[in-house]
Amino acid sequence: MDAKRTPPPPTPPNPNPSVIGSGAAADGGGFGRGEAAAATKHMLAFHFLRALSRIHRATPVTRRTRTIRRAAYSSMARAASPRRAWSRALLGQVRARRSRTLMRRAAVLVRRRVVAAPAPSPASARGVRIIAAGETSAAARAVPPPPRQQGEPPRAEALRRLVPGGAGMEYSSLLEETADYLRSLRAQVQLMQGLVDLFSYQ
């Protein structure tokens, strides 16, 4: 009597769609591209729903709207390939925003301690100056737009302003980044529309 063979465990979903896309390019088939698009949509939905779950119901509507918009862009960047300049730029904005939030909270704590204490210590005063200097130096490091490259159409500057991370990018790379950014935007809009339809039926 033959022994029963244990079936192999199922292959887990690939969180990096670029790996699937590279395999599809090697096989030369369109099915791999469909798998890559499906994996990207799954990762997009995962990151977006996880970000939405962190929003409190007691948050004001205006702040909640701003948080949802930021969650949409953040989930797009996390689901995209890390080789894309626009995804790295969006994630950099998320990290910078988080750093500014932590700095503001630290400044509030320092001010509370200064008000509570009759005589503020020199270390606390230095902390306040360091935070203020950091914010000023970050604003002073704003990079001016690069000069227009020879032979490129006038719409290139508009694309550089619209696509995150497009500043200083040559025109051929800018077109590639724009196409990938628009694909991610379309997937994000479809996801949000699906969520609206789902909750409207309930």
UniProtKB/Swiss-Prot annotation:
This protein's UniProt keywords: Brassinosteroid signaling pathway, Growth regulation, Transcription, Transcription regulation
Tissue and organ expression note: Highly expressed in roots and at lower levels in leaf blades, leaf sheaths, lamina joint, stems and panicles.
GO biological process, one term: response to brassinosteroid
Official protein name in the record: Transcription factor IBH1
Domain bHLH: 136-185
Additional facts recorded: Plants over-expressing IBH1 show erect leaves with reduced angles of inclination.
Biased composition range(s): Pro residues: 1-16
Family: Belongs to the bHLH protein family.
Biological role stated in the UniProt entry: Atypical and probable non DNA-binding bHLH transcription factor that acts as a negative regulator of cell elongation and plant development. Binds the transcription factor ILI1 and forms a heterodimer of antagonistic bHLH transcription factors that function downstream of BZR1 to mediate brassinosteroid regulation of cell elongation and lamina inclination.
Stimuli inducing this protein: Repressed by epibrassinolide.
Top-level taxon: Eukaryota
Gene: IBH1
Region (Disordered): 1-33
Assembly: Interacts with ILI1. Binds to ILI5/BUL1 and BC1. Interacts with BCL1 and BCL2.
Taxonomic source organism: Oryza sativa subsp. japonica
